């Protein structure tokens, strides 16, 4: 779906900018431009949340309070309403959204809010084979204070499919980028891993990419058929804290993870 795949970048005081996918991945690590570090302190705080197109009240309160001081906010089903765009540009330097579903007024898709401008941005889309509804993903890269480059993958995985072929297909271009990235990685979002075959495909992908799963001691993540839908995977970092907020502001509960730049335990 490369033809209709792009990201929209929202920055305070500037018109929205369309970002096209970079050229074909040539099997080598791209040369990134210089940039400002994502965080100036020793922690990287990441909020992950399927925001349900902001259809319920209190979504903004959750972002402001539970996500306070987050360096990255990875939203799924984010609809670019004036309220969300205003929140994003008032609290973050850059917000990049990949429109998956173009609704009559405001497109919906994954959106990554960041305290620094990304030095790399690659939007991705995959169409669900049954309902023909696209799902989106976004790969961005940010400098860290220790001079390493953090790759961030925000994904909303396909939901309705027979078997896991399309599910696995959506992960392939993400895997290409992670495999050629030598620095730390965070991959998070709504993976729709509601069946054993989907879980197996996801965990197999994580193993192949040398990604670890963030564990939540009080695991209140949204479930379907007894299986969690939202995950955070990482590489080249260590987890300092991880929590889930129980809320009615969406049909998913947001995840908050605090990373340290050091190596995993």
From Swiss-Prot:
Alphabetical list of SUPFAM superfamilies matching this protein = DNase I-like
Which organism does this record belong to?
Klebsiella pneumoniae (strain 342)
Arranged from A to Z, the UniProt key words for this protein are: Cytoplasm
Q: What is its main location?
A: cytoplasm
Matching InterPro entries: Endo/exonu/phosph_ase_sf, Endo/exonuclease/phosphatase, UPF0294
Select a single GO molecular function from the record's annotations and give it: catalytic activity
What name does this protein carry? UPF0294 protein KPK_4510
- Family indicated by similarity: Belongs to the UPF0294 family.
